[in-house]
């Protein structure tokens, strides 16, 4: 499952991130690539009725829309009643962040992977410094979290230690407002 995730979201996704693709089309295309490589097509996690199929793709501010799901980002979806997959009408334009949160599973083992791409020439973006700074802070937090994941560690203590290093300028959109660093897939 992890190998499929790496292949599809790290290696193939950039080929599908093209001008004019819709959020929904991108999510479904990547989901289909996972199925072609052996994903069983459903991911389960530790919530009541906790199943996900396609996951979601979001462009720009759509990724900051809060949903009922406890993921690190969100989507406006097609409408407020369908906040999943992504919008079939929101098309990718240059200068947008592309947020992908698409689960994968093989033989009952589930992995979860979220990636963010920038579509366009980041050097030409007037917010390039802010985007790079936010990226560097996220990498710092991820590396710190990974370094603390040791046998016997209490997850709540890891969360507290990481959040002590958190830059409050990002709190408005961090983990879509949730108080977690990950959730129960994998």
Question: Model features per residue range: what roles?
Answer:
Residues 1-186:
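Active-site neighborhoods and metal-handling regions in enzymes and metal-associated proteins
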